[in-house]
Amino acid sequence: MENGAARTVPAVIVAIDGPSGTGKSSTSKAVAAKLGLSYLDTGAQYRAITWWMVSNGIDITDPTAIAAVAGKPEIISGTDPSAPTITVDGTDVAAPIRTQEVTSKVSAVSAVPEVRTRITELQRSLATSAENGIVVEGRDIGTTVLPDADLKIFLTASPEARAARRSGELKGADVNSTREALLKRDAADSSRKTSPLAKADDAVEVDTSDLTLQQVIECVVTLVEEKRAAK
């Protein structure tokens, strides 16, 4: 009976938003794996298209130039939470999209409406085709990409906590410079005209500053299970 019950668990779409360094990726992957859901890192998609722009010599300061080629690269995301993948035109870009160069330019590329339209279409397609449900993490998932998501979560944390976490992820970055970069990124993401970083009105806010990763995961898993039980 248990196996039969497991198969009939309703699919659930979970949107997890928040700025960098709040634990979005670690939390989203763990929650998806624990609950048997697919997982999508939307930030990686924006990093991937930014990497492609840089690699092809596109002027990142020229929105018109970016818009003209936004549809060119083929970006494919693997949604297995235990081994998420991302390729651009068949090339594995999981490592190169995490460099400081890409990190410093992703906001400019992401702000171009044609880029957001292209990536948003990819995200919606992946979310609607996930048979068992999916955890989608990003900055505008609950507000723009999947406004009808079953559950919306907005993670926050103090700038200090975020910088400490982020400096451990990015090569060659110290905490102080990382903190400044994060605050600059926040300002850019929150003020852009197209799909700014924002908390959805119906999102559950979770401050991760003083929580361990495991505590955050348990909190989100509980929220998802409650939502799934109510469907």
Curated annotation (Swiss-Prot):
GO biological process: nucleobase-containing small molecule interconversion; pyrimidine nucleotide metabolic process
UniProt-listed Pfam families: Cytidylate_kin
UniProt keyword terms in alphabetical order: ATP-binding, Cytoplasm, Kinase, Nucleotide-binding, Transferase
Subcellular location: Cytoplasm
Chief localisation class: cytoplasm
EC number: 2.7.4.25
Reactions it catalyzes: CMP + ATP = CDP + ADP; dCMP + ATP = dCDP + ADP
Claim: DNA-binding is one of the keywords in the record: no
MF (Gene Ontology): ATP binding; CMP kinase activity; dCMP kinase activity
Keyword flag DNA repair: no
SUPFAM superfamilies linked to this entry: P-loop containing nucleoside triphosphate hydrolases
UniProt-annotated binding residues for ATP: G18, P19, S20, G21, T22, G23, K24, S25, S26
This protein's name: Cytidylate kinase
Species, as recorded: Streptomyces avermitilis (strain ATCC 31267 / DSM 46492 / JCM 5070 / NBRC 14893 / NCIMB 12804 / NRRL 8165 / MA-4680)
